[in-house]
């Protein structure tokens, strides 16, 4: 028998019995939290026009998208991200007076692993989007939803890391490097590759942003990390982002979530649409 007839494509897998049960149970728990908090479900097509992601501020490398063509020769992609299609829905199907809008999704995304690191090509995502609202209250709304979802999963020990996209963006902008070099720096910060980051930044030692960028992978821990970060820069955009993150952190601590929070200023995601608070849990 041809080996392609008995195996799955690279980055995919079959799920059987107990694995399916755990996956569906977790999905039900999280979506029930989202429904309780007033989020309504949307489902976007698994196949989208390539242009949707080419024109959006996603910065997702085109090599990571799984492509095909339709009968007219137009390029299609398997959905690599859920936020961008939801933004398309908001701009084409939702009236401005309906905002703010609370939407959630539970669907798979597909990304080719060009790094060769063995990452999954097909990834299930459950997420929430709060459209037409911003500021501290909106961020705290989404973050408290995340904490509630983690608690609902009966996790005794978990952490949610907090960062701010504006810190890296402001520092890299002041450095004045090409997009290719900026991406190398971002990858080093995100992976906490201190040695490689130091090698790249050596050419920019005289720049004001040098010390802060070099320190970013090490700036994780409790609230003291924010004070350390403030001592490394005088850039008003960076200090404003740090102060905002400090406000969010203090509010979450006052709400009783402090033991589950870790500050990580090395969070630097590839998606350009991240502009403010970022977080991830584990």
Which positions does each model-derived feature cover?
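A short beta-strand-loop structural module common to alpha/beta enzyme folds
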Residues: 40-46
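Auxiliary tRNA-acceptor-end handling modules of aminoacyl-tRNA synthetases
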Residues: 1-20
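Short, conserved phosphate-binding/catalytic loop or strand-edge motifs used
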Residues: 120-126, 162-170
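Acidic, His- and aromatic-enriched active-site or binding-groove loops in soluble protein domains
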Residues: 64-71, 176-206, 257
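Short glycine/threonine-rich loop-to-helix capping motif typified by GTGT followed
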Residues: 169-179, 272-279
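Glycine-rich loop at the start of a catalytic domain that most often binds anionic cofactors/ligands
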Residues: 52-65
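Positively charged, Gly/Ser-enriched RNA/tRNA-binding surfaces
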Residues: 19-37, 48-49, 68, 72-73, ...
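Short, surface-exposed recognition loops or helix-turn segments adjacent to catalytic cores
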Residues: 157-167, 185, 262-268
């Amino acid at each position: 028998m041809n080996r392609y007839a008995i195996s799955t494509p690279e980055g995919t897998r079959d799920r059987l019995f107990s694995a399916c049960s755990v996956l569906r149970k977790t999905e039900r728990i999280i979506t029930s939290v989202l429904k309780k908090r007033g989020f309504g479900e949307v489902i976007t097509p698994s196949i989208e026009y390539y242009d949707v992601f080419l024109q959006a501020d996603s910065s997702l490398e085109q090599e990571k998208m799984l492509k095909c063509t339709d009968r007219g020769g137009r390029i299609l992609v398997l959905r690599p991200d859920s936020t961008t299609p939801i933004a398309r829905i908001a701009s084409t199907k939702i009236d401005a007076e309906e905002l703010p809008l609370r939407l959630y999704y539970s669907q798979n995304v597909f990304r080719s692993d060009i790094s060769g690191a063995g990452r999954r090509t097909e990834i299930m995502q459950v997420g929430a989007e709060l459209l037409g609202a911003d500021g501290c209250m909106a961020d705290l709304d989404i973050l408290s939803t995340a904490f509630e979802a983690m608690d609902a999963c009966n996790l005794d020990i978990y952490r949610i890391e907090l960062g701010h996209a504006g810190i890296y963006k402001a520092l890299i902008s002041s450095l004045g490097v090409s997009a290719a070099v900026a991406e190398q720096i971002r990858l080093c910060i995100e992976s906490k590759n201190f040695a490689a980051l130091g090698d790249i930044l050596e050419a920019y030692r005289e720049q004001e942003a040098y010390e802060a960028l070099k320190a970013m992978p090490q700036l994780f821990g409790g609230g003291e990390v924010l004070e350390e970060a403030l001592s490394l820069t005088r850039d008003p955009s960076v200090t404003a982002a740090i102060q905002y993150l400090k406000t969010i952190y203090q509010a979450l601590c006052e709400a009783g979530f402090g033991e589950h929070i870790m500050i990580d200023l090395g969070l630097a995601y590839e998606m350009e649409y991240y502009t403010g608070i970022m977080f991830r849990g584990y």
